[in-house]
């Protein structure tokens, strides 16, 4: 039995294209406790699951906010993957929640920072979450923008949040009291946490750690009482 929750980074992305239905299905088959996914808005204000900010559509390289969902669905996300797999369409967040909120223990939703669309994305996300009774229980909303974390607390009553941090500069945007008030988790990347674990632990919040690479690192953090989730592209 695992000591912590093991979360598949953008799905089981070492064996399937990241942030695709196939990657999420693989994570389910291999018994991950949940998935980490990234969300952004399309031109027509649809929440889609992707880390990428631009796509080639009709032989043109376009930013995501220039593409409507119907055209984005034509892109094969598996075309450049290292293994030959079936064609994969981009997924809307609604499609992912419909299929995967039930079987997984947790869905970690990373809200990509886009100053032009942050408010619209949060409005759409808030409406969507109301359609899923398990949303508050199973979703953890993540952002590297502390302003977004505060907005989530104001508009998403009862939802768990995690502040994504990669360096000391990120820790300076909020006081310890603000972090305790607005965040349920701190979400440092592994290399930053490894070098600054005492400072982060002194903030007093549980940790979601990303991205773990290698069995030895995974086993090392198993004994860290602050680490509650390990995010990885491998099964351990």
UniProtKB/Swiss-Prot annotation:
Domain GP-PDE: 4-236
One MF annotation (Gene Ontology) recorded for this entry: phosphoric diester hydrolase activity
Pfam families in the cross-refs: GDPD
Superkingdom: Bacteria
Disulfide bond entries: none
Coiled-coil region(s): none
Keywords carried by this UniProt record: Hydrolase
InterPro entries linked to this entry: GP_PDE_dom (IPR030395), PLC-like_Pdiesterase_TIM-brl (IPR017946)
SUPFAM superfamilies: PLC-like phosphodiesterases
Single biological process term from Gene Ontology: lipid metabolic process
Record bears the keyword Hydrolase: yes
Family per record: To glycerophosphoryl diester phosphodiesterases (EC 3.1.4.46).
Alphabetized PANTHER family for the sequence: GLYCEROPHOSPHODIESTER PHOSPHODIESTERASE, CYTOPLASMIC (PTHR46211:SF1), GLYCEROPHOSPHORYL DIESTER PHOSPHODIESTERASE (PTHR46211)
Protein name in the entry: Uncharacterized protein MG385
């Amino acid at each position: 039995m695992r000591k912590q929750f093991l979360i598949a980074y953008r799905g089981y992305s070492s064996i399937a294209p990241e942030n695709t239905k196939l990657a999420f299905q693989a994570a389910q088959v291999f018994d991950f406790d949940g998935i980490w996914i990234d969300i952004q808005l399309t031109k027509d204000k649809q929440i889609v699951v992707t880390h990428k900010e631009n796509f080639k559509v009709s032989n043109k390289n376009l930013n995501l906010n220039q593409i409507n969902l119907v055209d984005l669905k034509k892109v094969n996300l598996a075309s450049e993957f290292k293994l030959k797999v079936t064609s994969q369409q981009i997924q809307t967040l609604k499609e992912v929640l419909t299929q995967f909120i039930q079987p997984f223990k947790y869905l970690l939703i990373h809200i990509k920072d886009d100053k032009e669309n942050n408010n619209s994305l949060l409005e759409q996300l808030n409406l969507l979450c109301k359609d899923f009774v398990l949303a508050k229980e199973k979703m953890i909303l993540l952002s590297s923008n502390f302003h977004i974390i505060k907005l989530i607390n104001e508009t998403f009553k009862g939802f768990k949040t995690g502040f994504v941090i990669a360096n000391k500069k990120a820790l300076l945007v909020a006081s310890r009291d603000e972090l305790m008030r607005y965040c349920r988790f701190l979400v440092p990347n592994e290399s930053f946490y490894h070098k600054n674990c005492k400072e982060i632990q002194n903030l007093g919040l549980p940790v979601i750690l990303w991205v773990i690479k290698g069995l030895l690192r995974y086993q090392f953090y198993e004994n860290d009482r602050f680490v509650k989730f390990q995010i990885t592209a491998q099964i351990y």
